[in-house]
Every structure is written in structure tokens, then in C-alpha cells.
């Protein structure tokens, strides 16, 4: 569900207010996905806003609106290739600003290594993911962390072996050829993740 802020009355033609999502039976919403962050950063840049924390503040408003409507939040964080040297600062800001004043008991963190997502890119390795997951747990007081950087059949068992990873965010099941989400492949990924 999209958790547009700005109230719950009026025309929201291309947005879905949090209360509308809750009324439809949604229990969770995804906030801060790298694509959403890029969109917001692009709009802010067009408006001349250069404050890098602005996106995190906007997402914080969405988190609070979602929680006020009774939704739980899957909050995405991640660093781009040019941010890897400062990953602790980038991810720390996304967490501290984005979750400021939020009920953390109703939040799960999805980690997206943005620099490694997509066809032809080198996936993040186990030591890197372990380091990030440990950092996120330390920064958030132990919130659940799921991996959102391409959980697929060929890395499901490896990701399941990481003690600080509590699950995965699966948007696609096939990353080459006919890219898409295929239910039978989704079930196979789950089977492999669970070790069955």
C-alpha cells in the first residue's frame, strides 16, 4: 500500500492514503523502497532541494501516517555504489531520521544493497550482508531485518544461514530472460530458504 500523507479526505487519484489501505484489509505497507527513494530525490532535486536528509524526513511522515492508520511497516534502507564508503552514515541516517518517533515494535527493516541489484551486477556477499544486518540490529534495538537485494533460488540457502537475517523481500523471482514474478519459482525460493 502507498501511504500518502496529507490527510484522509479529498481526491487522491494517484495515491492511496494509509487509512484507505487499512480499510481494504491491508496490514502492512512497504515504505522507502529504493525506487521510491529515487523518485522522491528526483522531485526534490527538480525543486532545488539539496538536503540529503529530506527524503528520509518525507519517508518518516509516511511511516507515521501508516502507523496511525494501524498498518505495520516494512521500511527499506540501502546504499548506492557511490555511498558504499559511507554506508554506516547513510544507513544510520535512513534509520534514525526515517523512524524518528515511530513505533518500532511495528516495523521490520528490509535491507537493499542498491549497488548490487539488477541484471549484470555482482550480488552482495555473505560477509557484507552479515555486517550490514548486524549494524541494523544494533542501531534499531534488534528489529527484524529481511534481505531485499534479490532473494532468489541460488542464494536462498546462503541468506537463510545468516543469523541476523530474519527473512526476505521478494519482488521478482526471475532476474534474466523473461524477468518477472512466477508463483512456482516463489514457492521454490521459500522451500530453499526454509531448507526443505
Regions found by a protein language model. Give the residues of each.
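Glycine/small-residue-rich loop that forms an oxyanion/phosphate-binding "nest" at active or ligand-binding sites
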Residues: 2-57
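Glycine-rich phosphate-binding active-site loops on the catalytic face of alpha/beta enzymes
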Residues: 30-39, 79, 103-106, 113, ...
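Catalytic cores of alpha/beta
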Residues: 150-165
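Glycine/Thr-rich beta-alpha phosphate-binding loop at enzyme active sites
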Residues: 7-14, 113-144, 151, 179-181, ...
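Hydrophobic faces of well-ordered beta-strands that scaffold small-molecule active sites
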Residues: 1-2, 29-31, 73-75, 107-111, ...
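Conserved anion-binding
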Residues: 37-121
Amino acid at each position: 500500500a502507498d501511504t500518502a500523507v496529507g490527510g484522509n479526505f479529498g481526491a487522491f487519484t494517484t495515491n492511496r492514503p494509509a487509512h484507505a489501505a487499512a480499510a481494504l484489509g491491508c496490514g502492512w505497507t512497504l515504505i522507502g523502497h529504493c525506487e521510491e527513494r529515487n523518485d522522491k530525490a528526483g522531485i526534490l532535486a527538480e525543486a532545488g532541494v539539496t538536503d540529503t536528509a529530506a527524503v528520509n524526513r518525507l519517508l518518516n511522515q509516511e511511516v507515521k501516517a501508516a502507523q496511525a492508520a494501524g498498518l505495520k511497516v516494512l521500511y527499506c534502507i540501502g546504499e548506492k555504489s557511490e555511498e558504499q564508503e559511507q554506508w554506516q552514515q547513510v544507513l544510520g541516517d535512513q534509520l534514525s531520521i526515517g523512524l524518528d518517533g515511530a513505533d518500532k515494535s511495528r516495523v521490520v527493516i528490509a535491507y537493499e544493497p542498491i549497488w548490487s541489484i539488477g541484471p549484470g551486477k555482482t550480488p552482495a556477499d555473505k560477509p557484507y550482508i552479515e555486517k550490514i544486518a548486524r549494524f541494523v540490529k544494533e542501531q534499531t534495538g534488534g528489529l527484524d531485518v529481511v534481505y531485499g537485494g534479490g532473494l532468489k533460488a541460488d542464494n536462498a540457502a546462503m541468506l537463510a544461514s545468516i543469523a541476523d537475517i530474519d527473512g526476505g523481500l521478494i519482488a521478482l523471482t526471475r532476474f534474466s530472460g523473461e524477468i518477472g514474478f512466477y508463483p512456482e519459482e516463489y514457492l521454490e525460493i521459500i522451500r530453499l530458504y526454509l531448507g526443505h
